[in-house]
C-alpha cells in the first residue's frame, strides 16, 4: 500500500508552485488538483476527493475543448467517487458524460471506451439492474 499522506504532501507542494507560476485556468493546475483528489480517494476521504476532482473539472471545462479526453477522465474520476460512496444515480450521470466524450474523441476500439462501458455496467450491477448491466 502506498504512502498516500506523503504523496499528498508532495502534490500540495507542487500545486503551490503551479499556482504561483501558471494562470488560474491552466490545465496543469487541473491535473494537479486531480492528483490531490486521487490521493484523498486512495486515503478513503471521498468528500475531499470529490472537492478536488470538481476543482480540476471546472478548470478543464474552461480551458479545454468540449470533446477533450481529459474532460472525459475528469467526469470518470467524479463518477468513481460517487460509485464508491454508493450514489449510483450520480455515478451514472458522470460516467455517461465521460462516455459521450470518449465516443466522439476516441477510435471505437480504444481501451478507454472498454473501461467506460465497464464502469457503467458495474454501476447498473451495483444497483441490482443486472439485465441493464449486461448491455454494457
Tell what function each PLM region has.
Residues 15, 27-42, 57, 69-84, ...:
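Conserved alpha-helical positions within TPR/SEL1-like repeat arrays
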Residues 20-24, 62-66, 104-108:
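Short coil/turn linkers that connect adjacent helices within long alpha-helical scaffolds
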Amino acid at each position: 500500500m502506498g504512502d498516500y499522506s506523503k504523496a499528498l504532501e508532495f502534490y500540495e507542494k507542487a500545486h503551490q508552485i503551479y499556482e504561483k507560476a501558471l494562470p488560474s485556468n491552466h490545465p496543469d493546475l487541473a491535473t494537479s488538483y486531480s492528483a490531490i483528489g486521487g490521493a484523498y480517494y486512495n486515503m478513503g476521504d471521498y468528500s475531499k476527493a470529490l472537492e478536488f476532482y470538481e476543482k480540476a473539472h471546472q478548470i478543464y471545462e474552461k480551458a479545454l475543448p468540449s470533446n477533450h479526453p481529459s474532460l472525459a477522465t475528469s467526469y470518470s474520476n467524479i463518477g468513481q467517487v460517487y460509485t464508491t460512496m454508493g450514489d449510483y444515480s450520480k455515478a451514472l450521470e458522470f460516467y455517461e458524460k465521460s462516455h459521450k466524450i470518449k465516443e466522439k474523441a476516441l477510435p471505437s476500439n480504444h481501451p478507454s471506451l472498454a473501461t467506460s462501458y465497464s464502469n457503467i455496467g458495474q454501476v447498473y450491477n451495483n444497483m441490482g439492474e443486472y439485465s441493464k448491466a449486461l448491455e454494457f
